[in-house]
Amino acid sequence: MELSPRAARNRGEYKRLSIYTIAASILAAACIVALIFTVWFTAVIIDDRGMEPTLERGDAVLCDKLALTFSSPKRGDMLCYRAVYGGGVYMGRVVGLAGEEVAINGGSVYINGCLLKEDYITEACPVDMESITVGEGMFLLLPDARSSMQSTASEELIISAERIIGRVAVRVAPISSVAVFE
């Protein structure tokens, strides 16, 4: 059955509109994804060995910038934070919270005099640290690879809340090691 000229014209216009609708939908979805990643996440490539074995050099992670808007960091959280000088981004694990007294003695971390159990640590810390009290709005962060610590200078370990970028949420690369962190 042959279509009338008007029906053939309508069919052609319908196909053209369908292509535009699909293209507009894809563009809108791409814009929404870009907006979410700009506002919600920061991508970071690990360039040192400080968080091994949890995160290795060359891993790509997404730091959730909004997670800390609704809750404070907890002990054990992995955080991305801005360096004091040079503008670099570093990673560390929350060990000490505001008001706590933290010491490192004989390779072990003590919080308010009690030994901190850390399942993610494979090597003891090679340096001792006198007991220090973490100030209000501050967090004491340590690397997982404690054997790489050369210093326990508090200005390097105690991070203000303003310097925190976000909580490490997902390892996205390499693909074989994709993981979600809680």
Model-identified regions with their sequence ranges:
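Extended hydrophobic leader/signal-anchor segments used for secretion and membrane insertion
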Residues: 1-182
